[in-house]
A protein has these predicted regions:
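Bacterial signal peptide processing site
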Residues: 20-22
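C-terminal motif of bacterial Sec signal peptides marking the signal peptidase cleavage site
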Residues: 15-18
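Primarily recognizes the serine-hydrolase "nucleophile elbow" in alpha/beta-hydrolase
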Residues: 196-273
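Short amphipathic alpha-helix adjacent to the substrate-entry channel of hydrolases
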Residues: 151-166
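A domain-start/cap signature at the N-terminus of enzymes
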Residues: 33, 41-124
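Short beta-strand element of the alpha/beta-hydrolase
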Residues: 97, 113-119, 128-143
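Alpha/beta-hydrolase active-site loop
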Residues: 179-200
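Conserved alpha/beta-hydrolase
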Residues: 163-177
Length: 274
């Protein structure tokens, strides 16, 4: 359904900008988009649900070490970075993640070395949420399908979410230089690893949401429309993602998602030609 929606929106934009100035042009465009949708449908038909999303959880990765949290006092946030979310990463400079948790969701003890040992506090609230009900946000900042750098410290871009009581997972991911679908594969692996830590860290693992704009919006849309798709199984196996857990998100926020690249190119060419 998402594919048809994106294709329809893109076609409508073309017609509004004047690409359909003649009936023949509009008919040709409609036929082309329809054919594309049918081809994509047949390509994915029968692929079904990922076999890696059900059954017993299997991984050699450890769960998050609750004795290694760092603390940002200005924003009252506990965080960890450099967390490996796959066993056999293709690019270790990207394939780690950070997690950022509102301070009230933790009961913490200072280790005296810049780290804190934390346990989950289920009674405190931040906004409308507790540690058990807090949504988990996965930002996708990949303009032009670029790579997303793995966080190395406190990430101030997460502050609006954490101030509202949400948990934020910032996952480094490969970009277009690595080829598709590397970026989405990495993000799926990070979501799987996050779910693997259910009950260990704060956050409602049934309420994971991705968000992004432009190329990031496109990859957020893919996360939303390909949850637990078997099409990604081979790629997830290749990097050693956690199995036996879901990579589906509850929703995806997609601002200006650039998805239907062929039609977008046609629109640019038509406008530049004027």
């Amino acid at each position: 359904m998402f594919k048809y929606r994106f294709l329809s929106v893109s076609l409508a934009l073309l017609l509004l900008t004047g690409c359909g100035s003649s009936a023949a042009t509009a008919a040709d465009s409609t036929a082309s988009v329809s054919d594309t949708a049918q081809n994509e449908d047949s390509d994915t038909a029968g692929t079904g649900t990922s076999a890696l999303s059900t059954g017993t959880v299997q991984t050699n990765l450890s769960q998050i070490d609750m004795s290694k949290w760092q603390y940002d006092s200005d924003n009252d946030v506990y965080y960890q970075v450099g967390i490996s979310y796959c066993e056999t990463p293709a690019d270790t400079s990207y394939e780690t993640m950070g997690i950022y948790v509102p301070g009230k969701y933790m009961t913490a003890k200072d280790n005296g070395d810049g780290t804190w040992t934390c346990s989950v506090n289920t009674t405190e609230k931040v906004g409308n949420y507790t540690a058990s009900t807090a949504p988990v946000i996965v930002p996708v900042n990949t303009p032009g399908y670029a790579a997303q750098a793995a966080p190395t410290g406190y990430d101030s871009s997460t502050s609006e979410f954490t101030a509202a009581g949400m948990v934020v997972v910032v996952a480094g991911c490969r970009g277009r230089d690595a080829g598709a679908p590397s970026g989405v594969t990495d993000l799926k692996a990070a979501i799987r690893y996050t779910r693997y830590n259910e009950g260990v860290i704060p956050g409602n693992m049934d309420s994971i949401f991705s968000e992004g704009m432009s190329g990031g919006g496109a990859q957020s849309a893919l996360l939303g429309s390909t949850g637990d798709s078997a099409l990604y199984d081979a790629y997830l196996k290749q990097i050693g993602a956690v199995t036996g857990v879901s990579d589906a998100v509850a929703g995806s926020m997609c601002w200006c998602p650039i998805t239907n690249l062929d039609v977008a190119d046609e629109a640019y060419e038509w406008n530049m030609g004027q």
